[in-house]
């Protein structure tokens, strides 16, 4: 593998090998990351990358699209079947572009949209001032109840009645609880708004049937195809409304994108096929079991979990009682081979670049085959590292760093990722 890269560009070959080693021997706990199958990876690295295919299957602006049409048709049909939707657009290059397409299809610049505050668990594209969504549209943010740290639906309704948004967005990037889509739809209908659900984080759980399906309630649903879906990096839009589908298709192309990434779309098709298997369903069940187990074990060790736990693949740890910043915790853990990300918490007092919490997710470690027993050990290692931080920069005592790094590697060796599947590369 990569023998041609090695010959043509040794520097990039070195990057590939070192990143492969990092993934193979490190514990990946970033909630938005996962490990794609070799089938998905091979499809992304295929000759399909050579083909321009502006337009849609059967309606292209280029000739020679017979086989890429077939790939996109498979991706569309599988996405529709997987999520129970009448229409699917598989061309968005990312979740952010999927969200942008929906906004521009259903609203005009200057219209009001409503989404969850970033500091309460939302996403940049849900109206953050630094993002296109916050610059193009007037934004009203809702948040969580500071006592329960769960969505305050009464506040959502109150804000919706007051501001009459064109679009209400449900979903987030750091919200660990199941969202009541039915309640959101009732609020949207009451004020004449479109309900858009961004299920980027929990799409895999939905595909497996272990999480409520927003397609049943929302006017339109967006997602990424990586994260819990375990596919290539890309976006997806679903709807049951033919008029919305037409508007979305026109907004994606020619509105905000040109040529689709056919190698990625084909890899999405592979991902959707994998997600239809019983093995995938069992995997998603274990993802949630592992997240719940980790949250419970963290609580036993004195850590405060935002909202008290999780219903999904992720949870937030408030490090304020431990007098550790999220930035320091992230750096300390990374120095020992454990990757998480710093994250703001509800009622955050620090800058997002420092933050008071960390976000932990289990999709990637579960892909390796790890279960509850391993989650206990991982929590033990996390606690050991965080208890050994010596300064605000996240420096860890050398002897602790060496011990934890060794134990992390040993654990990863017991649950190999690509090591036994890739030939020609010394890992």
UniProtKB/Swiss-Prot annotation:
Give the binding site residues for (6S)-5,6,7,8-tetrahydrofolate.
118, 122-124, 243, 351-353
Main location as per UniProt: cytoplasm
Site entry (Plays an important role in substrate specificity), positions: 226
Q: Kindly give the PROSITE patterns that the UniProt entry links to this protein.
A: SHMT
Q: Which cofactors?
A: pyridoxal 5'-phosphate
Record's Pfam families?
A: SHMT
The catalysed reaction is:
(6R)-5,10-methylene-5,6,7,8-tetrahydrofolate + glycine + H2O = (6S)-5,6,7,8-tetrahydrofolate + L-serine
Q: In which pathway does it act?
A: One-carbon metabolism; tetrahydrofolate interconversion; Amino-acid biosynthesis; glycine biosynthesis; glycine from L-serine: step 1/1
Q: What class of enzyme is it?
A: transferase
Instruction: Name the UniProt key words of this record, in alphabetical order.
Output: Amino-acid biosynthesis, Cytoplasm, One-carbon metabolism, Pyridoxal phosphate, Transferase
Q: Which residues are modified to N6-(pyridoxal phosphate)lysine?
A: 227
Q: Which GO terms describe its biological process?
A: glycine biosynthetic process from serine; tetrahydrofolate interconversion
Q: What is its EC number?
A: 2.1.2.1
GO MF terms, alphabetically ordered: glycine hydroxymethyltransferase activity; pyridoxal phosphate binding
Record's GO cellular component terms: cytosol
Its subcellular locations are: Cytoplasm
Subunit structure, interactors included: Homodimer.
UniProt lists the family membership as follows: Belongs to the SHMT family.
Biological role: Catalyzes the reversible interconversion of serine and glycine with tetrahydrofolate (THF) serving as the one-carbon carrier. This reaction serves as the major source of one-carbon groups required for the biosynthesis of purines, thymidylate, methionine, and other important biomolecules. Also exhibits THF-independent aldolase activity toward beta-hydroxyamino acids, producing glycine and aldehydes, via a retro-aldol mechanism.
Quote the protein name from its UniProt record.
Serine hydroxymethyltransferase
User: Which gene specifies this protein's sequence?
Assistant: glyA
